[in-house]
Amino acid sequence: MPRNASVRARSFAADHRSGCSHQTLHTKKTINAVAAPRSNSAPRFRETEFADYAGIMSLLARHGLSTPGIEQWKYLWLGNPSYTRQCPLGWVMEVDDKLVGYFGNIPLAYELEGQQVRAASGRGWAVDQDYRSFSLYLLHAFFSQSETDLLLNTTANVRGEAAFCSLGGVPAPNEITQESAFWITDATGFSELFLRRKGVPFHSVLKYPVAAAASVLQHIRQAAPGKMQVERFAGFDEKFDRFWNKLRNEKRAVLLGRRDRATLAWHFHYALKKNNCWIFGVVQGRELLAYAVFDRTQHRELGLQRMRLVDYQSLADLQPLAAIISLAIRCAKEAGIHMVEVAGCRIEARVKKELAPFTRPIRATCLYRAPHRALAAQLATPARWDTSLYDGDSSL
Protein backbone atom coordinates (compact mmCIF):
# COMPACT_ATOMS: atom_id res chain seq x y z
CA MET A 1 0.00 0.00 0.00
CA PRO A 2 1.15 3.62 -0.51
CA ARG A 3 3.10 5.06 2.39
CA ASN A 4 0.43 7.61 3.28
CA ALA A 5 -2.47 5.16 3.14
CA SER A 6 -3.14 5.51 6.86
CA VAL A 7 -3.99 9.20 6.55
CA ARG A 8 -6.03 8.94 3.37
CA ALA A 9 -9.79 8.98 3.09
CA ARG A 10 -11.40 5.57 3.11
CA SER A 11 -10.47 3.74 -0.08
CA PHE A 12 -13.06 2.09 -2.28
CA ALA A 13 -10.75 -0.89 -2.78
CA ALA A 14 -10.27 -1.30 0.96
CA ASP A 15 -14.02 -1.61 1.51
CA HIS A 16 -14.66 -3.84 -1.51
CA ARG A 17 -11.55 -6.02 -1.77
CA SER A 18 -13.69 -9.17 -1.76
CA GLY A 19 -15.59 -7.85 -4.76
CA CYS A 20 -12.61 -7.80 -7.10
CA SER A 21 -13.69 -9.12 -10.48
CA HIS A 22 -10.29 -10.40 -11.59
CA GLN A 23 -6.86 -11.28 -10.37
CA THR A 24 -4.05 -8.84 -11.11
CA LEU A 25 -2.69 -10.03 -14.44
CA HIS A 26 1.00 -9.25 -14.09
CA THR A 27 2.99 -7.31 -11.54
CA LYS A 28 5.70 -4.89 -12.57
CA LYS A 29 8.32 -7.57 -11.88
CA THR A 30 6.84 -9.89 -14.50
CA ILE A 31 6.11 -7.45 -17.32
CA ASN A 32 8.96 -8.94 -19.34
CA ALA A 33 7.31 -12.34 -19.15
CA VAL A 34 4.52 -11.25 -21.47
CA ALA A 35 6.92 -10.02 -24.14
CA ALA A 36 7.69 -11.85 -27.35
CA PRO A 37 10.22 -14.70 -27.43
CA ARG A 38 13.69 -13.32 -26.98
CA SER A 39 15.72 -12.48 -30.05
CA ASN A 40 18.04 -9.72 -31.14
CA SER A 41 15.09 -7.57 -32.23
CA ALA A 42 12.44 -8.60 -29.69
CA PRO A 43 11.27 -5.66 -27.55
CA ARG A 44 11.79 -5.49 -23.81
CA PHE A 45 9.17 -3.97 -21.49
CA ARG A 46 9.83 -2.17 -18.22
CA GLU A 47 8.52 0.65 -16.06
CA THR A 48 9.33 4.19 -17.10
CA GLU A 49 12.08 6.12 -15.31
CA PHE A 50 12.68 9.86 -15.26
CA ALA A 51 15.95 9.16 -17.07
CA ASP A 52 13.88 8.03 -20.09
CA TYR A 53 12.81 11.61 -20.81
CA ALA A 54 14.93 12.17 -23.94
CA GLY A 55 13.98 8.85 -25.49
CA ILE A 56 10.28 9.37 -24.78
CA MET A 57 10.27 12.88 -26.23
CA SER A 58 12.01 11.63 -29.36
CA LEU A 59 9.36 8.92 -29.71
CA LEU A 60 6.46 11.33 -29.14
CA ALA A 61 7.91 13.79 -31.66
CA ARG A 62 8.09 11.03 -34.28
CA HIS A 63 4.36 10.52 -33.80
CA GLY A 64 3.37 14.18 -33.85
CA LEU A 65 2.50 14.32 -30.14
CA SER A 66 3.30 17.16 -27.76
CA THR A 67 6.78 17.19 -26.21
CA PRO A 68 6.85 19.20 -22.97
CA GLY A 69 10.09 20.37 -21.39
CA ILE A 70 11.68 18.09 -18.84
CA GLU A 71 10.55 20.09 -15.79
CA GLN A 72 6.97 20.23 -17.04
CA TRP A 73 7.01 16.51 -17.80
CA LYS A 74 8.38 15.60 -14.36
CA TYR A 75 5.82 17.89 -12.72
CA LEU A 76 3.03 15.56 -13.88
CA TRP A 77 4.20 13.31 -11.04
CA LEU A 78 6.49 15.27 -8.71
CA GLY A 79 4.00 18.12 -8.35
CA ASN A 80 0.97 15.81 -8.28
CA PRO A 81 -0.72 15.54 -4.84
CA SER A 82 -1.90 12.02 -5.78
CA TYR A 83 1.55 10.68 -6.69
CA THR A 84 3.45 8.24 -4.49
CA ARG A 85 6.67 6.39 -5.28
CA GLN A 86 4.68 3.18 -5.62
CA CYS A 87 2.86 4.61 -8.63
CA PRO A 88 4.45 3.73 -12.00
CA LEU A 89 5.33 6.67 -14.24
CA GLY A 90 4.29 4.47 -17.14
CA TRP A 91 5.86 1.75 -19.24
CA VAL A 92 8.31 1.72 -22.13
CA MET A 93 9.16 -0.72 -24.89
CA GLU A 94 12.78 -0.76 -25.99
CA VAL A 95 14.86 -2.55 -28.60
CA ASP A 96 18.65 -2.40 -28.50
CA ASP A 97 18.49 0.41 -25.90
CA LYS A 98 16.20 2.52 -28.12
CA LEU A 99 12.70 3.41 -26.92
CA VAL A 100 10.15 2.30 -29.51
CA GLY A 101 7.00 2.42 -27.37
CA TYR A 102 5.59 4.32 -24.41
CA PHE A 103 2.43 4.48 -22.31
CA GLY A 104 2.28 7.15 -19.59
CA ASN A 105 0.44 6.70 -16.29
CA ILE A 106 -0.91 9.69 -14.34
CA PRO A 107 -2.33 9.08 -10.83
CA LEU A 108 -5.53 10.96 -10.03
CA ALA A 109 -7.87 11.14 -7.04
CA TYR A 110 -11.65 10.80 -7.33
CA GLU A 111 -14.51 10.44 -4.88
CA LEU A 112 -17.86 8.69 -4.98
CA GLU A 113 -20.36 8.44 -2.12
CA GLY A 114 -17.78 9.77 0.31
CA GLN A 115 -15.21 7.12 -0.58
CA GLN A 116 -11.85 7.67 -2.20
CA VAL A 117 -11.45 6.20 -5.68
CA ARG A 118 -7.81 5.84 -6.68
CA ALA A 119 -7.63 6.47 -10.41
CA ALA A 120 -4.99 6.47 -13.12
CA SER A 121 -5.13 8.03 -16.56
CA GLY A 122 -3.22 6.84 -19.60
CA ARG A 123 -1.17 9.44 -21.44
CA GLY A 124 0.95 9.64 -24.59
CA TRP A 125 0.54 6.11 -25.97
CA ALA A 126 2.92 5.83 -28.91
CA VAL A 127 4.58 2.86 -30.61
CA ASP A 128 6.82 2.87 -33.69
CA GLN A 129 5.35 1.22 -36.77
CA ASP A 130 7.61 -1.84 -36.77
CA TYR A 131 6.50 -2.74 -33.24
CA ARG A 132 2.76 -2.00 -33.37
CA SER A 133 1.98 -5.70 -32.94
CA PHE A 134 3.34 -5.40 -29.39
CA SER A 135 1.29 -2.30 -28.50
CA LEU A 136 -1.19 -4.16 -26.30
CA TYR A 137 1.57 -5.21 -23.92
CA LEU A 138 1.89 -1.58 -22.81
CA LEU A 139 -1.87 -1.27 -22.32
CA HIS A 140 -1.84 -4.62 -20.51
CA ALA A 141 0.70 -3.24 -18.03
CA PHE A 142 -1.52 -0.19 -17.46
CA PHE A 143 -4.50 -2.47 -16.75
CA SER A 144 -2.45 -4.62 -14.37
CA GLN A 145 -1.89 -1.99 -11.68
CA SER A 146 -2.78 -3.43 -8.29
CA GLU A 147 -3.24 -0.21 -6.30
CA THR A 148 -5.79 1.43 -8.59
CA ASP A 149 -9.59 1.36 -8.46
CA LEU A 150 -10.33 3.12 -11.75
CA LEU A 151 -8.50 3.33 -15.09
CA LEU A 152 -9.31 6.20 -17.45
CA ASN A 153 -8.59 7.09 -21.05
CA THR A 154 -10.05 10.40 -22.22
CA THR A 155 -7.91 11.13 -25.29
CA ALA A 156 -8.02 7.88 -27.28
CA ASN A 157 -8.42 7.94 -31.05
CA VAL A 158 -10.56 5.33 -32.82
CA ARG A 159 -7.81 2.69 -32.82
CA GLY A 160 -6.91 3.42 -29.21
CA GLU A 161 -10.53 3.07 -28.15
CA ALA A 162 -10.80 -0.32 -29.86
CA ALA A 163 -7.65 -1.52 -28.10
CA PHE A 164 -8.81 -0.22 -24.71
CA CYS A 165 -12.18 -1.96 -25.08
CA SER A 166 -10.55 -5.20 -26.26
CA LEU A 167 -9.00 -5.57 -22.80
CA GLY A 168 -12.19 -4.85 -20.88
CA GLY A 169 -12.54 -1.08 -21.01
CA VAL A 170 -15.93 0.46 -21.79
CA PRO A 171 -17.22 3.93 -22.75
CA ALA A 172 -18.60 5.90 -19.83
CA PRO A 173 -22.42 6.02 -20.01
CA ASN A 174 -22.41 9.79 -19.65
CA GLU A 175 -24.80 12.11 -21.42
CA ILE A 176 -22.23 14.26 -23.19
CA THR A 177 -23.37 15.50 -26.57
CA GLN A 178 -21.10 14.74 -29.53
CA GLU A 179 -20.88 18.37 -30.53
CA SER A 180 -19.20 21.50 -29.28
CA ALA A 181 -20.61 24.97 -28.87
CA PHE A 182 -18.38 27.85 -29.92
CA TRP A 183 -18.31 31.59 -30.42
CA ILE A 184 -16.06 33.37 -32.94
CA THR A 185 -14.22 36.21 -31.24
CA ASP A 186 -11.91 37.22 -34.11
CA ALA A 187 -14.00 36.73 -37.25
CA THR A 188 -11.45 38.21 -39.66
CA GLY A 189 -8.56 36.15 -38.33
CA PHE A 190 -10.75 33.05 -38.16
CA SER A 191 -11.72 33.33 -41.83
CA GLU A 192 -8.19 34.14 -43.01
CA LEU A 193 -6.76 31.05 -41.34
CA PHE A 194 -9.22 28.76 -43.07
CA LEU A 195 -8.84 30.42 -46.46
CA ARG A 196 -5.06 30.02 -46.25
CA ARG A 197 -5.39 26.28 -45.82
CA LYS A 198 -5.49 24.35 -49.06
CA GLY A 199 -8.57 22.26 -49.73
CA VAL A 200 -10.96 24.14 -47.44
CA PRO A 201 -14.19 24.86 -49.36
CA PHE A 202 -15.09 28.54 -49.34
CA HIS A 203 -18.67 27.76 -48.32
CA SER A 204 -17.39 26.13 -45.10
CA VAL A 205 -16.01 29.51 -44.06
CA LEU A 206 -19.12 31.40 -45.07
CA LYS A 207 -21.15 29.32 -42.61
CA TYR A 208 -19.53 31.45 -39.90
CA PRO A 209 -20.20 35.02 -41.05
CA VAL A 210 -17.72 37.86 -40.78
CA ALA A 211 -20.32 39.63 -38.68
CA ALA A 212 -19.94 36.92 -36.03
CA ALA A 213 -17.87 39.11 -33.70
CA ALA A 214 -20.53 41.82 -33.64
CA SER A 215 -23.16 39.13 -33.14
CA VAL A 216 -21.27 37.75 -30.14
CA LEU A 217 -21.16 41.15 -28.47
CA GLN A 218 -24.88 41.59 -29.06
CA HIS A 219 -25.60 38.25 -27.38
CA ILE A 220 -23.42 39.26 -24.44
CA ARG A 221 -25.52 42.37 -23.91
CA GLN A 222 -28.69 40.29 -24.08
CA ALA A 223 -27.28 37.86 -21.53
CA ALA A 224 -26.54 40.47 -18.87
CA PRO A 225 -26.03 38.55 -15.62
CA GLY A 226 -28.08 40.95 -13.49
CA LYS A 227 -26.99 40.69 -9.86
CA MET A 228 -24.57 37.85 -10.59
CA GLN A 229 -21.02 39.17 -10.31
CA VAL A 230 -18.34 37.21 -12.15
CA GLU A 231 -14.73 37.82 -11.12
CA ARG A 232 -11.42 36.75 -12.61
CA PHE A 233 -8.81 35.13 -10.34
CA ALA A 234 -5.04 35.08 -10.71
CA GLY A 235 -4.82 31.64 -9.07
CA PHE A 236 -6.45 29.29 -6.59
CA ASP A 237 -6.81 30.50 -3.00
CA GLU A 238 -8.41 29.19 0.19
CA LYS A 239 -11.91 29.88 -1.18
CA PHE A 240 -11.44 26.90 -3.49
CA ASP A 241 -10.80 24.58 -0.53
CA ARG A 242 -14.03 25.69 1.13
CA PHE A 243 -15.87 25.39 -2.16
CA TRP A 244 -14.53 21.86 -2.68
CA ASN A 245 -15.76 20.73 0.74
CA LYS A 246 -19.26 21.92 -0.13
CA LEU A 247 -19.17 20.53 -3.66
CA ARG A 248 -18.08 17.03 -2.60
CA ASN A 249 -21.06 16.86 -0.23
CA GLU A 250 -23.56 18.17 -2.77
CA LYS A 251 -22.33 15.78 -5.46
CA ARG A 252 -21.70 12.66 -3.38
CA ALA A 253 -23.62 10.55 -5.89
CA VAL A 254 -21.40 11.63 -8.81
CA LEU A 255 -17.88 10.40 -9.61
CA LEU A 256 -15.94 13.57 -8.96
CA GLY A 257 -12.27 14.33 -9.51
CA ARG A 258 -10.61 16.04 -6.55
CA ARG A 259 -10.76 19.82 -6.86
CA ASP A 260 -9.12 21.15 -3.73
CA ARG A 261 -6.74 24.09 -3.97
CA ALA A 262 -3.59 21.96 -4.19
CA THR A 263 -4.91 19.69 -6.93
CA LEU A 264 -6.25 22.56 -9.04
CA ALA A 265 -2.94 24.42 -8.66
CA TRP A 266 -1.05 21.33 -9.88
CA HIS A 267 -3.42 20.63 -12.77
CA PHE A 268 -3.25 24.17 -14.16
CA HIS A 269 0.28 25.08 -13.00
CA TYR A 270 1.92 25.36 -16.41
CA ALA A 271 -1.14 26.82 -18.12
CA LEU A 272 -1.07 29.63 -15.54
CA LYS A 273 2.70 30.00 -15.80
CA LYS A 274 2.45 30.45 -19.58
CA ASN A 275 -0.52 32.85 -19.34
CA ASN A 276 -2.72 30.29 -21.06
CA CYS A 277 -5.28 29.96 -18.28
CA TRP A 278 -8.31 32.01 -17.20
CA ILE A 279 -10.08 31.41 -13.89
CA PHE A 280 -13.52 32.94 -13.39
CA GLY A 281 -15.75 32.68 -10.35
CA VAL A 282 -18.97 33.86 -8.77
CA VAL A 283 -18.33 35.09 -5.23
CA GLN A 284 -20.76 36.06 -2.49
CA GLY A 285 -19.00 37.66 0.46
CA ARG A 286 -15.98 35.46 1.18
CA GLU A 287 -17.47 32.35 -0.40
CA LEU A 288 -17.09 30.95 -3.90
CA LEU A 289 -20.41 29.80 -5.39
CA ALA A 290 -19.21 28.69 -8.83
CA TYR A 291 -16.08 28.72 -10.95
CA ALA A 292 -14.88 27.93 -14.46
CA VAL A 293 -11.38 27.43 -15.84
CA PHE A 294 -10.51 28.01 -19.50
CA ASP A 295 -7.23 27.28 -21.25
CA ARG A 296 -5.69 28.34 -24.55
CA THR A 297 -4.89 25.78 -27.24
CA GLN A 298 -3.59 26.22 -30.77
CA HIS A 299 -4.26 24.09 -33.84
CA ARG A 300 -0.85 22.97 -35.10
CA GLU A 301 -1.60 23.20 -38.81
CA LEU A 302 -3.91 26.22 -38.91
CA GLY A 303 -2.56 28.28 -36.05
CA LEU A 304 -6.16 28.67 -34.86
CA GLN A 305 -6.24 29.76 -31.21
CA ARG A 306 -9.07 28.55 -28.98
CA MET A 307 -10.07 29.41 -25.46
CA ARG A 308 -11.76 26.21 -24.29
CA LEU A 309 -13.75 25.49 -21.16
CA VAL A 310 -11.87 22.88 -19.13
CA ASP A 311 -13.77 22.78 -15.85
CA TYR A 312 -17.00 24.27 -14.56
CA GLN A 313 -18.56 23.62 -11.16
CA SER A 314 -21.47 25.29 -9.41
CA LEU A 315 -23.24 24.86 -6.10
CA ALA A 316 -26.95 24.15 -5.73
CA ASP A 317 -29.20 25.45 -8.52
CA LEU A 318 -27.05 28.41 -9.47
CA GLN A 319 -26.61 28.63 -13.26
CA PRO A 320 -23.91 31.23 -13.93
CA LEU A 321 -22.28 29.60 -16.96
CA ALA A 322 -23.84 32.01 -19.47
CA ALA A 323 -22.50 34.97 -17.50
CA ILE A 324 -19.08 33.32 -17.17
CA ILE A 325 -18.87 32.56 -20.89
CA SER A 326 -19.84 36.14 -21.65
CA LEU A 327 -16.81 37.36 -19.70
CA ALA A 328 -14.61 34.68 -21.31
CA ILE A 329 -15.68 35.90 -24.76
CA ARG A 330 -14.66 39.45 -23.87
CA CYS A 331 -11.27 38.25 -22.58
CA ALA A 332 -10.70 36.14 -25.71
CA LYS A 333 -11.47 39.10 -27.95
CA GLU A 334 -9.05 41.31 -26.02
CA ALA A 335 -6.34 38.63 -26.24
CA GLY A 336 -6.74 38.17 -30.01
CA ILE A 337 -7.99 34.58 -29.64
CA HIS A 338 -10.08 33.33 -32.55
CA MET A 339 -12.82 31.44 -30.70
CA VAL A 340 -14.23 30.29 -27.36
CA GLU A 341 -15.33 26.65 -27.22
CA VAL A 342 -17.30 24.45 -24.83
CA ALA A 343 -16.90 20.73 -25.48
CA GLY A 344 -16.84 17.42 -23.66
CA CYS A 345 -19.32 18.43 -20.96
CA ARG A 346 -23.00 19.10 -20.45
CA ILE A 347 -24.01 22.48 -21.82
CA GLU A 348 -26.74 24.30 -19.94
CA ALA A 349 -29.80 25.02 -22.07
CA ARG A 350 -29.59 28.59 -20.82
CA VAL A 351 -26.20 29.02 -22.51
CA LYS A 352 -27.53 28.04 -25.93
CA LYS A 353 -30.61 30.19 -25.49
CA GLU A 354 -28.84 33.34 -24.34
CA LEU A 355 -25.55 33.16 -26.23
CA ALA A 356 -26.63 31.36 -29.45
CA PRO A 357 -23.36 29.56 -30.21
CA PHE A 358 -22.32 27.90 -33.43
CA THR A 359 -21.98 24.13 -33.14
CA ARG A 360 -19.78 21.52 -34.77
CA PRO A 361 -19.60 17.72 -34.45
CA ILE A 362 -16.79 16.34 -32.32
CA ARG A 363 -15.70 13.01 -30.93
CA ALA A 364 -15.95 13.15 -27.15
CA THR A 365 -15.10 9.84 -25.47
CA CYS A 366 -14.34 8.86 -21.90
CA LEU A 367 -13.26 5.23 -21.53
CA TYR A 368 -12.86 3.49 -18.20
CA ARG A 369 -12.28 0.19 -16.48
CA ALA A 370 -13.23 -0.52 -12.87
CA PRO A 371 -11.65 -3.79 -11.64
CA HIS A 372 -13.86 -4.05 -8.54
CA ARG A 373 -17.39 -5.33 -9.12
CA ALA A 374 -19.11 -2.96 -6.70
CA LEU A 375 -17.58 0.15 -8.27
CA ALA A 376 -18.17 -1.20 -11.78
CA ALA A 377 -21.86 -1.67 -10.96
CA GLN A 378 -22.16 1.88 -9.65
CA LEU A 379 -20.43 3.40 -12.67
CA ALA A 380 -22.72 1.60 -15.11
CA THR A 381 -25.37 4.21 -14.27
CA PRO A 382 -25.34 7.45 -16.34
CA ALA A 383 -26.26 9.54 -13.29
CA ARG A 384 -22.85 8.74 -11.76
CA TRP A 385 -21.00 10.61 -14.51
CA ASP A 386 -20.49 14.31 -15.17
CA THR A 387 -17.23 14.47 -17.11
CA SER A 388 -15.37 17.43 -18.58
CA LEU A 389 -11.95 18.20 -20.03
CA TYR A 390 -10.69 18.26 -16.43
CA ASP A 391 -10.98 14.48 -16.26
CA GLY A 392 -8.20 12.15 -17.33
CA ASP A 393 -5.33 13.84 -19.17
CA SER A 394 -7.41 15.97 -21.58
CA SER A 395 -6.07 19.25 -20.19
CA LEU A 396 -2.78 18.27 -18.56
Predicted segments — roles?
Residues 46-125, 232-312:
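A conserved beta-strand-loop-helix scaffold within acyl/acetyltransferase catalytic domains
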Residues 26-50, 212-238:
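Conserved N-terminal entry element of GNAT/NAT acetyltransferase domains
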